[in-house]
Amino acid sequence: MNPLTLIIIMFTLFMGTMITVFSSHWLTMWIGLEMNMLAIIPILINKATPRSTEAATKYFLTQATASMILMMAITLNILDSGQWTLINPQNQLTPVLITLALIIKLGMAPFHFWVPEVTQGVPLKSGLILLTWQKLAPLSILYQISPSINPTMMMSVAILSIMVGGWGGLNQTQLRKILAYSSIAHMGWMAAIITFNPNTMVLNLIIYILMTIPMFMMFMQHSSTTTLSLSQMWNKNPLMVSTILITLMSLGGLPPLTGFIPKWIIIQELTKNGNIILPTAMAMLALLNLYFYMRLIYSSSLTMFPTTNNLKMKWQFESTKRMPLITPLIILSTMLLPLTPALSVLN
């Protein structure tokens, strides 16, 4: 892609998200979402292969459907209230439709089917943008309308997303699909807390992004996309593989790593609100995610795949890519737990 074209597309993507995040008007919010959707399509098909084209088409059709539902909900809100601002909707159907549209855009269960397929079909850089930056705009709208969201609907979506995120990743050998199912599970945790404490949802989102970015950066550093390539990397760069495995444990929410913070705070917040069974079920289902991360760790480090002479010589072809931000991001993604007492301001 032409560098100037790429700059324009990335600027449009950035502006679309910022317009949505900082807007309190439904029309500008919708325009920002559409700018965001149209700008990401060329990024997804940056390498024009049949697979990336198919992934971009799936993404476009899904997002267009969600945008149509959202526009219908906005129209109903205008007919009922006569205003374009984000106020408590008078019609009970309006917040349900808005929530439904945003759930589709975020790829939460039961509308999650496009997330693993699209993530698998695009390059690692595009997958990183898809699973991190593209979550900001829809979640900002959910944050603003959180007082009018149906808690029962969101808790059902949350439990289902955590379950799907755990079960879906069990049989996967593709690293991008594993991270896609991890994203679905993390979206479930955010959905569970948004009606009770939206600020905790923001904290969860920040920590999720801090953990996902270094994972993708480490995969990009060595062009690893499968568990086989990850295990073969052990011969070439054992320190990097060890870091990847620790970050995977953090993504799974294993204490005392960073990923344990949001789960701990969310379970505490739900318990304070009188929910005992739901956080218990969420914690049990989260073990599925931790299980397939631990299995990936076992297959990558404790068992060694057969190595050939060509593989042993890979040290001569070290990657020349340099990512200076990767070290502080790795530290943040694994060692943030000592800062947790300072997060008591959220309570």
Swiss-Prot record:
It is an enzyme of class 7 (translocase). Keywords: Electron transport, Membrane, Mitochondrion, Mitochondrion inner membrane, NAD, Respiratory chain, Translocase, Transmembrane, Transmembrane helix, Transport, Ubiquinone. GO terms for cellular component: mitochondrial inner membrane; respiratory chain complex I. Its EC number is 7.1.1.2. It is a multi-pass membrane protein. It is found in: Mitochondrion inner membrane. GO terms for biological process: mitochondrial electron transport, NADH to ubiquinone; mitochondrial respiratory chain complex I assembly; reactive oxygen species metabolic process. The chain crosses the membrane at residues 3-23, 59-79, 95-115, 127-147, 149-169, 178-198, 200-220, 241-261, 274-294, 325-345. It catalyses: a ubiquinone + NADH + 5 H(+)(in) = a ubiquinol + NAD(+) + 4 H(+)(out). InterPro entries: Complex_I_Subunit_2, NADH_DH_su2_C, NADH_UbQ_OxRdtase_chain2, ND/Mrp_TM. The keyword NAD applies. GO terms for molecular function: NADH dehydrogenase (ubiquinone) activity. Its main location: mitochondrion. Belongs to the complex I subunit 2 family. Core subunit of the mitochondrial membrane respiratory chain NADH dehydrogenase (Complex I) which catalyzes electron transfer from NADH through the respiratory chain, using ubiquinone as an electron acceptor. Essential for the catalytic activity and assembly of complex I. Core subunit of respiratory chain NADH dehydrogenase (Complex I) which is composed of 45 different subunits. Interacts with TMEM242. This is NADH-ubiquinone oxidoreductase chain 2. The lineage of its organism: Eukaryota, Metazoa, Chordata, Craniata, Vertebrata.
